[in-house]
């Protein structure tokens, strides 16, 4: 199988590329101007891509996107987050749609933020979208693949939860919500639940995230797929489990107003103080088996 990956240098993309190469697949990255790596040249900001080089792939995986939680959501930052996902996906979708030999599948990133703040409701792939910037982003992100869908390409929307990796993403930010990791509250024994601690945090181990993407490549599933473990936890339980793995106390709560002051209200609410009790219905029904089904195992794998 020949697979092109956009975002192959990221935390998830790099592990996915290695996993596919390890089983004998041909993996080619999509590379931006100035990259020293060989691959399919593209520049989403300029709307350009090497169309001929995309001919003949079996699948394309698009994980590209500017980091959502690194900076406050100013107007400029919001636009950068939006364009890096929507415009890159539109470029890929319309390019794949006109190829003489298009790929059979486009596996495209999304997020459980699609559902907004779900409260205690169990959210399957058929649950409606929520409100707010992150929900609007995910709705537009998934809609940006429409040209590929109309061309008969099988499209999968990866609605990922919190991917457990100490090297980046939401877990990396949790370890250092107020700055660099060396002043992380958890590493100094000052961590605790954030806000009320009752918000649901859907999570998935990095290993299972990558295995689920490979599963999406190998099977005929299409449409939205919740990439989350079957046992979501509240922020309070997540924090306690993290404290046990790090061997640090978790007795000092972090008030929601502190996060809103530091991060901005919209970012703090969307990424930390709100939650989704998402369920991996499509994965389970399609025969996927999780390696890490409980949060303790997932966190041990992340720090192992």
PLM region spans:
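N-terminal Rossmann NAD(P)H-binding glycine-rich loop of SDR-like oxidoreductase domains
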Residues: 3-23
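Mid/C-terminal beta-alpha module of Rossmann-like enzyme folds, strongest
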Residues: 212-213, 218-266, 300-303
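Alpha-helical substrate-binding/gating segment
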Residues: 176, 180-191, 198-232
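Conserved beta-loop-beta element that borders a ligand/cofactor-binding pocket
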Residues: 110, 143-166
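NAD(P)H-binding glycine-rich loop region in Rossmannoid oxidoreductase-like domains
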Residues: 35-91
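Glycine/proline-rich active-site loop of Rossmann-fold NAD(P)-dependent oxidoreductases
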Residues: 139, 151-153, 163-179, 215-225
